[in-house]
């Protein structure tokens, strides 16, 4: 029975040599995630949902979730369940992380083993704050990782439905599209907004190109809009407010307050995105490799500016990782806001460059990542976890754009970069030890 279902969905049970290697990487990734997730502690809201909310039966669970004051019905309910069962929490998070890894491999068509391994490594390298708030924190994981998993599943089934010829397979895939696209909207507000717009955009592009729309696309659009409607209208209809949610994710009322919020949130976005050292480093390395073809480039000045910006962001990201995040200065938001503008300009330049060289998918993904930031500039509050979707989409763009040859050359550069960083860290550590010993001696003498 199970084999027939998989066959109808379009995934073959018998794997080629490449698929076997892919399965090995997926298994290794799953085991690693299971170990990590098992030992991650409960933090922040996890402790509140575990010890501050008394749930004695399913009626208490439904009543709390439905009247909590926001539309994160599946996110909040799953957190309440998982914080009460350690093994279920570790197992479910490991399975979902591995599933996202597998979906990236399939959707981005990563056929080479090196590309597969590189995707798994980069998945584990968001900023430190994102990692803590999204991978470790169960509430963050459920509200920001699970919707990505569900929507990627919907897109995967939608893609398979385009290739399906049997009616039974089309019906099964159509049901899967709806059952993943609609629930994906019931976790976090920024994911809901982006997924709804993405689904409508997919439908609009299909109508524009083909002058018609397929049934699977209609199901995707309807499911996304229906889920977004429940997410948005649910709290207003139920009129619940048990968690002080009435002022959550609100837009300022005055124009002056809007500009002030844009400045503050832009600085926060610059800070949180700057911490993604892996992303900026690999993009800077790819830019430097492209300089070899500079004599063939008609827009040499723009290419050179992009390379300078990429190397600058990578360098600042390393400094930020080591020390800058601990620096407290009155004018530091100005620095981060400027870096945010550089980040956005750099990504716009990359999107335009992808279009020029014929990598339309990477260009669209890069632009989509930029779009996810814009709504967050005018709402409060924001934190590192809300920018995870932005980082994830940019990660997809990098994986989609990079070739096997470019990846091999990048790994050589990354090795040299890591050696340089290691040498720098050793010097910093030795200096800290020396100053620490001097301070200790001075305190003893005193």
Task: State where each predicted segment sits.
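Short hydrophobic alpha-helices at membrane interfaces in multi-pass membrane enzymes
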Residues: 160-182, 215-219, 410-413
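Transmembrane-helix motifs of polytopic, lipid-linked glycan transferases
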Residues: 94-115, 153
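Signature aromatic-anchored transmembrane alpha helix within multi-pass, membrane-resident enzymes
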Residues: 304-311, 352-370, 405-429
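Start-transfer (signal-anchor) and selected internal transmembrane alpha helices
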Residues: 1-33
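Transmembrane alpha-helices and membrane-interface helical segments
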Residues: 102-106, 153-160, 198-207, 281-287, ...
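Membrane-interface micro-motifs in multi-pass membrane enzymes
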Residues: 72, 121-159, 188, 328-347, ...
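Transmembrane catalytic cores of multi-pass membrane glycosyltransferases
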Residues: 35-84, 88, 182, 189-197, ...
């Amino acid at each position: 029975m199970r084999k027939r279902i998989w066959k109808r969905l379009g995934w073959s049970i018998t794997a080629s040599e490449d698929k076997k290697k892919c399965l090995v990487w997926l298994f290794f990734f799953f085991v690693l995630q299971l170990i990590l997730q098992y030992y991650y502690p409960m933090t922040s809201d996890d402790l509140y949902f575990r010890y501050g909310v008394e749930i004695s039966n399913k009626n208490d669970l439904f009543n709390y979730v439905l009247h909590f004051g926001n539309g994160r019905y599946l996110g909040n309910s799953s957190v309440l369940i998982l914080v009460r069962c350690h093994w279920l929490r570790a197992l479910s998070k490991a399975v979902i992380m591995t599933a996202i890894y597998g979906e990236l491999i399939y959707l981005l068509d990563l056929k080479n083993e090196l590309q597969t391994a590189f995707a798994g490594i980069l998945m584990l390298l968001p900023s430190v704050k994102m990692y803590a708030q999204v991978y470790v924190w169960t509430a963050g994981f459920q509200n920001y990782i699970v919707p990505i998993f569900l929507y990627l599943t919907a897109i995967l089934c939608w893609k398979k439905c385009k290739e399906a010829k049997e009616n039974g397979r089309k019906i099964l895939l159509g049901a899967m599209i709806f059952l993943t696209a609609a629930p994906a909207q019931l976790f976090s507000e920024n994911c809901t907004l982006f997924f709804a717009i993405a689904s409508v955009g997919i439908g609009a592009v299909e109508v524009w190109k083909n002058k018609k729309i397929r049934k699977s696309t209609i199901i995707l659009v309807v499911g996304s809009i229906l889920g977004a409607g429940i997410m948005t209208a649910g709290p207003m209809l139920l009129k619940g407010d048990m968690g002080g949610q009435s002022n959550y994710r609100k837009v300022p009322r005055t124009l002056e307050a809007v500009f002030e919020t844009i400045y503050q949130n832009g600085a926060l976005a610059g800070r949180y995105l700057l911490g993604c050292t892996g992303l900026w480093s690999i993009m800077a390395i790819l830019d430097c490799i492209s300089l070899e073809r500079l004599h063939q480039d008609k827009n040499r000045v723009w290419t050179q500016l992009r390379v300078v910006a990429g190397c600058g962001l990578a360098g600042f990201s390393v400094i930020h990782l080591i020390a800058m995040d601990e620096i407290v200065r009155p004018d530091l938001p100005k620095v981060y806001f400027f870096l945010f503008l550089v980040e956005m300009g750099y990504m716009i330049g990359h999107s335009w460059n992808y279009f020029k060289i014929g990598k339309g998918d990477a260009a669209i993904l890069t632009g989509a990542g930029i779009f996810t930031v814009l709504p967050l500039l005018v709402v409060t509050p924001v934190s590192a976890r809300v920018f995870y979707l932005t980082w994830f989409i940019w990660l997809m763009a990098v994986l989609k754009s990079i070739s096997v040859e470019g990846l091999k050359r990048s790994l050589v550069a990354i090795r040299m970069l890591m050696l340089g960083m290691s040498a720098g860290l050793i010097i910093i550590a030795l200096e800290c030890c020396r100053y620490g010993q001097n301070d200790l001696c001075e305190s003893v003498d005193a």
